[in-house]
Amino acid sequence: DRYEADTLHNLSKAGKPLLVRYDLAGVKKALTKDALRERPDGLWKWRELLPVRKCADIVSLGEVETPLISLPKLARKLGGGEIIVKDEGRLPTGSFKARGLVMAVSMGKALGITHMAMPTNGNAGAALAAYATSCGIKTTIFCPADTPEVNVSEIELQGATVYRVNGLIDDCGKIVGEGKAKAGWFDTSTLKEPY
């Protein structure tokens, strides 16, 4: 099945995650290397390769292009080839989760979402709350009861309402899914939003 990009979706009719496809041939024609060189560095430099169509819908907290760092001592110690890590800790919320959630929130803004919810026990909730709060989208987070206090505090400080659930992350996910119709939130659970 085909699903239009400018419509709200969670899973496919078959209950499977949706994957976004881009017209790379069209992007190649529309975007030149010279145009890229003239743009400021950062995630949105690559906007033609991202799902947000209008610049006015971009939600940003200053995402940077995160560097690749070579670890030659570790490579020697392990006796293998080159080891390179990507330093995603430089993203605004200090986690790679910011990279995906900036897209989810920007698309949510573009599609008129006013309330987002997710199950999490940490970084994803903080990233969702930071981006959503920055553009006026209400955020509700469900965490297992044993989620470390520092994680819950970070999510709350970013502007979300947090509920602790006596159960596992799957139980939190069920609450988000079941509460969608009643609470009117968009389910931003992992693999339940395509961006």
Predicted regions and their residues:
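PLP-dependent amino-acid enzyme catalytic core
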Residues: 1-195
